[in-house]
Amino acid sequence: MKILIINSGSSSIKYQLMVMPANEVICSGMIDRIGLETSNITFKTVSNSFEEILPVPTHKVGLQKVADMLLDAETGVIKTTSEITAVGHRVVHGGSYFSNTTVITEEVKEKIKELSELAPLHNPAHLVGINVAEEIFASAKQVAVFDTAFHQTIPVEAHKYAIPNFLLTEHKVRVYGFHGTSHKYVSEKAINYLEKGSKIITIHLGNGCSMTAVKDGKSIDTTMGFSPANGLVMGTRAGDIDQSVIFYMVKSLGYTPDEVNSILLKQSGMLGLTGYSDLRDIESKASEGNKDCQLALLMNAYRIRKTIGSYAAALNGLDAIVFTAGIGENSSFMRNLICTDMDYFGIEIDKEKNQIRSKELREINTPNSIVKILVVPTDEEFEIANQVYQLLEN
């Protein structure tokens, strides 16, 4: 069966067409900078690839462009949209409503919309992608795969906040966790590599960042909480912050709640500390002596190291730490900064192995390291396709 995977972000669309269960990628690509005159469009098959700059004003135009590329007489990979059995959509927040992959109905869309308040950078964009895909790929099943689903196994002592019970029971305020599709995929890869039930910390570092403690394949704790704003220092998100700062900004500094929300989600993190949100720029400026960039990198690494310690305690031991996503897979500098002087935990990084670039799972620890240090490229699109296939087959 042919399954189209769509990851619709606030200003981008990632897509991949796969044949399941053969795990064959027919084509993949991305449209980013949607809404600008200089939208970047990529399309790649086994035998062909191209990139072009075109104005893509809306997600609807973008998804129509994806369909046109798939159907193109010369470079396309399908003859009609009816060849696609299902469209799998990544959805960041499923709240307490969705603990499993779900066929999308009008009721499901209403719930995703309702949860947009908790994931304002993500859920609205996912809804746009779903609505447009329903029009363009009308004969296909539309299926949602939720980032929060993997974290439904977190025990109550870890997911419950120390607040009045009515907020949990009536308003479902709790730790939900995010990046679950990625954490699930890379933890399974690591477990297969280690060939045993294991205690693993997965570290997803991209523009958004999160960590998860995984015991025998199940999430038992994670850094993101009620929303994707919590936890580690991120590209534009502050991560952990004393809630009193929010009250201070509103009561004493005169900001509205919406303004505070915008500051903490879109103007904070590495951007707020340095003026840059892209780690490549920050690393470059730090190497040139920029003190703000140097400090921001140290702050980022410190919070990750501190979390490794707390999760090792929660797991009662540690077999491996796993780096993944754009920064985790590609920044040898950050991996080294995080893992240096962690020998107390039995973590010793091999600086030469750490420099090696590869698209395969690789081990970058020294022979003496008690804890394995793995770099595992994530493949959220494959994980989504696999979950969609399993749902429809069963």
Curated annotation (Swiss-Prot):
It comes from the Bacteria. Keywords: ATP-binding, Cytoplasm, Kinase, Magnesium, Metal-binding, Nucleotide-binding, Transferase. Its main location: cytoplasm. Its EC number is 2.7.2.1. Mg(2+) binds at residues 7, 380. Mg(2+). Can also accept Mn(2+). InterPro entries: Ac/propionate_kinase, Aliphatic_acid_kin_short-chain, Aliphatic_acid_kinase_CS, ATPase_NBD. Pfam families: Acetate_kinase. CDD domains: ASKHA_NBD_AcK_PK (cd24010). ATP binds at residues 14, 204-208, 278-280, 326-330. Transmembrane segments: none annotated. Pathway: Metabolic intermediate biosynthesis; acetyl-CoA biosynthesis; acetyl-CoA from acetate: step 1/2. GO terms for molecular function: acetate kinase activity; ATP binding; magnesium ion binding. It is an enzyme of class 2 (transferase). The keyword Kinase applies. Belongs to the acetokinase family. PANTHER family: ACETATE KINASE (PTHR21060), ACETATE KINASE-RELATED (PTHR21060:SF15). This is Acetate kinase.
